[in-house]
Swiss-Prot record:
The gene is tgt. One of its GO terms (cellular component) is cytosol. Homodimer. Within each dimer, one monomer is responsible for RNA recognition and catalysis, while the other monomer binds to the replacement base PreQ1. Its EC number is 2.4.2.29. This is Queuine tRNA-ribosyltransferase. It comes from Lachnoclostridium phytofermentans (strain ATCC 700394 / DSM 18823 / ISDg) (Clostridium phytofermentans).
Length: 378
């Protein structure tokens, strides 16, 4: 259940109660595709850096180790030793990104595994069953992820199919939550709004799915090639047609600046691979933009990544040492950067929540964006 605590303009400060605890929103979910954060960051580390929600991938876990294996081992929470909320995506994005390897039918999608080429079928019911086996806190509906750009005709057909699939997801989720051997009988379902950059299609779809009284709603199919200004326009024009009394989730977005802009437009939930991916490439997020620790100027630098940062890495290690680890191709260097970056995102969300409560989000956002723009020679 979602409780709106307060608003500052369109920015919402809320609390989402789940069977695995309360989520303070706006929130950034830390992406652990195969039930682990890439970069050797454990769930113990996630607890220490203030992670509220972990996100795992249905498609990847279905292919390996298999959702039945995870179920036999007690579900994702027990499997990865994490007692806070977990959101699983539906697998749709991954399936539809296998463009040459898949075939869309009304019942679902036929595709080949990226691991061994084995033929797999996934439709709304299959996605719900897999996510039920994983026993995540929040399951995402199985939707078609249309290509960008797409013709209006294609988009209308695709969105209509996504709506039909959503109804099937809801019915199957309701059924699964009543079964005796279901691990999480309180699994929640979020629907996904699609429509590309066609505002009228997005708005009509938002109105339609809002009638279904789901636990939350996501904006899908963004950050797939459209400009940032187009993405912000779509968020601004679509969010008012989604229920304010439910959380809104912007899937796969994004940079710290993207998050600030989306919060201002009423978004509650975010996820993105950037903090971990950039960390694995030697980049650290700071309040003054991204820093490339591979840069030679940090060789003799005994300062932390960011002065005043409360993460366990900045409290203990220097830029010079981290640079050495990266140059020596030591896994520890990547782990340090991923840990710092996730902490940076989690801390920023904490500051955003505080700014909304104090009714000064606009000035907080302005100051933050000015800091990011000051990135020079990092």
């Amino acid at each position: 259940m979602y409780k709106l605590i307060c608003k500052d303009g369109n920015a919402k400060r809320g609390e989402f109660t789940t069977v695995h605890g309360k989520i303070q929103t706006p929130v950034f979910m830390n992406v652990g595709t195969a039930a682990a954060i890439k970069g050797a960051v454990s769930t113990m580390d996630l607890q220490e850096i203030g992670t509220q929600v972990e996100l795992s991938n249905t498609y990847h876990l279905h292919v390996r180790p298999g959702d039945e294996v995870v179920k036999k081992l007690g579900g994702l929470h027990k499997f990865m030793v994490w007692d806070k909320p977990i959101l699983t995506d539906s697998g749709g994005f991954q399936v539809f990104s296998l463009a040459g390897l898949r075939k869309i039918k009304e019942e679902g999608v036929y595709f080949n595994s990226h691991i061994d080429g084995k033929k797999i079928f996934m439709g709304p019911e299959e996605s719900m069953r897999i996510q039920s086996n994983l026993a995540s806190t929040i399951a995402m509906a199985f939707d078609e992820c249309p290509p960008h750009p797409a013709t209006r005709e294609y988009m209308e057909d695709s969105v209509a199919r996504t709506t039909r699939w959503l109804l099937r997801c809801k019915n199957e989720m309701n059924r699964l939550n009543t079964l005796e051997d279901t691990i999480n009988k309180h699994q929640m379902l979020f629907g996904i709004n699609q429509g590309g950059t066609y505002t009228d299609i997005r708005v009509e779809h938002a109105k339609r799915i809002s009638e279904l009284d789901l636990d939350g709603y996501a904006l899908g199919g963004l950050a797939v090639g459209e400009s940032h200004s187009e993405m912000y326009r779509i968020i601004e024009e679509t969010v008012p047609y989604l229920p304010e009394a439910k959380p809104t989730y912007l899937m796969g977005v994004g940079t710290p600046a993207n998050i600030l802009e989306a919060v201002e437009r009423g978004v509650d939930f975010f996820d993105c691979v950037y903090p971990a991916r950039n960390g694995r490439h030697g980049h650290a997020y700071t309040n003054h933009g991204k820093m490339n620790l591979l840069n030679a100027k940090y060789e003799l630098d005994d300062r932390p990544i960011e002065e005043g940062c409360g993460c366990p890495v900045c409290k203990n290690y220097s830029r010079g040492y981290i640079r050495h680890l990266l140059k020596a191709k030591e896994m520890l260097g990547l782990r340090f950067l991923v840990t710092h970056n996730l902490y940076f995102y989690n801390k920023m969300m904490e500051e955003i929540r505080e700014a909304i409560e104090n009714q000064n989000f606009a000035s907080y956002k302005k100051k933050k964006l000015e800091g990011f723009a000051a990135e020079q020679g990092n």
